[in-house]
Regions:
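C-terminal non-catalytic regions of proteins with extracellular/luminal or membrane-system context
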Residues: 1-48, 57, 116-117, 217, ...
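Short acidic, glycine-rich surface-loop motifs adjacent to enzyme active sites
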Residues: 122-140, 232, 312-339, 520-549
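Surface-exposed loop and adjacent secondary-structure segments within mature catalytic domains
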Residues: 26-30, 34, 155-307, 312-317, ...
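N-terminal hydrophobic targeting/anchoring segments and the immediately downstream early-domain regions
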Residues: 7-196, 205-206, 216, 221-224, ...
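Mid-to-C-terminal alpha-helical segments outside catalytic/metal-binding sites
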Residues: 428-448
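Structural recognition of the beta-strand scaffold that forms the well-ordered cores
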Residues: 88-94, 130-135, 162-167, 171-173, ...
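Second-shell residues forming the walls of enzyme active-site clefts
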Residues: 85, 149-158, 248-408, 412-417, ...
Length: 551
């Protein structure tokens, strides 16, 4: 028995020592990363030629074409690409989440509280990544300050490649992760399904222009929307993010939405749109979403695959900067049943060749590897149809399918190994990096990536923006029927009418009618209904994506 206790004690002691050593190494590593970053935080020099000032991003004392705002777009791209090493090129092809402190501070170490587990400095300076998406953010002023600090860090790297920040929608009323990344100080607008209810293209353009201004005020330059999916399956959890089931209406409003955010063409006053989810999310088997393995199948019993492509024609006409394929498997539509981003017939043949799209293709988030803590998987990988492949094999298959960037992961080492082994040619990497750099240049990030912190508070939540959002909310309400009672239409309600309410603010209704707790005594009842759904808890995301049978 003593030997058993000795063995247990030795095992525990060894484990403790290993953990302690790992902790020390971890601390030293990130201390060094932070030290290097803080040491580098002085501004790069500037150059003056013919009365114009330029940023000397590579600090070589001369004006390179990529630093010259007067050079052609293609000349700038090719010059920068020629100066980039393979690590810098590979870094462009990842688009992971990034953490931000509660007060807008840069996170020097991995921080679970920021819904992220890696150091900001590590991502920028070691992994050479320059595209990030945000989840929860602090108040706009703190966010703008954080964004400027982030760009300052990026400026100090060898070539000074600026950061591009992206976001899911932040202007709706739904406040849960994965649907609306709400910021309480942005103006509030209807969800896309509400805009669709108005059928108003000009209103949709106006929303895009206002949302674009508020995004840019805090440094968000890529919108991970609109959703050009069709709501052909009523059990699907994401209908609120679509423009409904009418493909023609969806195409028209998708184009208007993108025009509002981007303008006629990408420029310094644009927010680039990443339209999703090619070739159309929505036809989900049993209504189950493709975030989950049981919802991986997209089915077309009416042979309507092509119908789901129609909204994307609007996106192409509006020159959407990027396209995001969905997780789903288009069952029986191509020669292999694999997720869209792994499917060459979907990306290269259909999107690139048939539809002539040459913009950025970025995968949906987490198709290569899931997210977890200490081996506990919180969110599984959406590697539908290729689960049997290793991570490097998945990366290779997606790149061969035609994607340019991977959302949600930061597996730079794995891609570097594929290039160094010859499994993926550097020429193929260059093809994607060109597309990614083109958007950065078009947005003006190489010339001035910073925001005016003094104006952030004047723009975000501006009174006229809020008022226009409220008017849009009113306009999107659809009256289905107005019965006549005693020769008088039921609506508008009479001032003294007795009203019974459920799931609606009694205080708000009491301004217009008398609220009663008795349904029997009420003249009218106003109920806010929720679509029936099946509670599930197999995955973290299931906690906020309500889906399933409508019984």
């Amino acid at each position: 028995m003593k030997k058993v206790f000795k063995f247990i004690a030795w095992t525990l002691g060894t484990l403790l020592a290993v953990l302690l050593l790992a902790f020390v190494v971890f601390q030293l590593y990130f201390m060094e990363i932070n030290r290097q970053a803080k040491k580098a935080l002085k501004e790069k020099p500037t150059l003056t030629e013919n009365g114009h000032t330029f940023r000397d991003l590579n600090a070589n004392g001369k004006l390179d074409p990529y630093e010259d705002s007067h050079a052609t777009l293609e000349a700038r791209i090719e010059d920068l690409l020629s100066q980039m090493n393979i690590e810098e090129k590979v870094g462009q092809m990842w688009h992971p989440p990034i953490g931000i402190g509660a007060e807008g501070e840069i996170l020097g170490k991995p921080d679970p509280g920021a819904i992220f587990f890696n150091s900001t400095y590590h991502l920028l300076l070691h992994k050479k990544i320059s595209h990030f998406n945000l989840f929860k953010i602090p108040n706009p002023a703190a966010h703008a300050a954080w964004y400027n600090k982030l760009q300052k860090i990026a400026e100090q790297d060898r070539l000074g490649i600026p950061v591009t920040i992206s976001s899911d929608p932040r202007h709706g009323a739904l406040n849960f992760l994965g649907n609306d990344m709400l910021s309480s100080q942005f103006s509030k607008w209807p969800e896309p399904i509400g805009l669709a209810a108005t059928g108003d293209s000009l209103l949709t353009v106006e929303f895009g222009r206002i949302a674009s201004q508020e995004y840019r005020a805090v440094g968000i330059r890529t919108a991970l929307h609109p959703m050009a999916d069709l709501a052909t399956e009523p059990r699907w959890a994401r209908i609120n993010g679509t423009f409904g089931e009418d493909a023609g209406l969806s195409a028209r409003l998708t184009a208007a939405y993108i025009f509002g955010f981007q303008g006629d063409s990408l420029g310094s006053e644009s927010v680039a749109c990443m339209t999703k989810h090619w070739p159309g999310g929505g036809p989900q088997e049993k209504g189950d979403d493709a975030h989950f393995r049981y919802g991986m199948n997209q089915v077309y019993p009416g042979k309507n695959f092509d119908y789901h492509l129609i909204p994307f024609e609007g996106a192409f006409k509006a020159h959407t900067a990027a396209i995001m394929p969905y997780y789903g498997v288009p069952v029986g539509q191509t020669s292999e049943d694999v997720g869209m981003s792994f499917n060459k017939e979907i990306i290269t043949d259909l999107l690139r060749k048939k539809h002539g799209y040459d913009g950025v293709v970025c995968t949906d988030w987490g198709i290569l590897k899931g997210f977890g803590i200490l081996g506990w998987e919180l969110v599984e990988a959406k590697d539908h149809g290729v689960r049997h492949l290793s991570v490097p094999e998945k990366i290779k298959k997606a790149i061969e399918a035609g994607v340019d960037q991977f959302g949600g992961n930061d597996l730079t080492d794995e891609l570097l190994q594929l290039v160094r082994s010859g499994a993926i040619g550097e020429q193929r990497i260059d093809e994607s990096v060109r597309r990614l750099l083109r958007v950065k240049f078009q947005l003006g990030l190489f010339d001035n990536p910073y925001v005016d912190e003094g104006k952030t508070g004047e723009i975000v939540g501006r009174a006229d923006f809020v008022e226009k959002g409220l008017l849009a909310q009113k306009k999107c309400i659809v009256l289905l029927k107005n019965d006549t009672l005693a020769s008088t239409p039921a609506l508008p309600l009479q001032r003294r009418a007795k009203v019974y309410v459920e799931n609606i603010s009694r205080e708000a209704v009491s301004k217009y009618a008398t609220v009663t707790d008795s349904l029997a005594d009420a003249d009218f009842a106003i109920l806010r209904l929720q679509t029936p759904w099946e509670p599930r808890n197999g995955d973290f995301i299931e906690s906020f994506l309500n889906q399933g049978y409508l019984d």
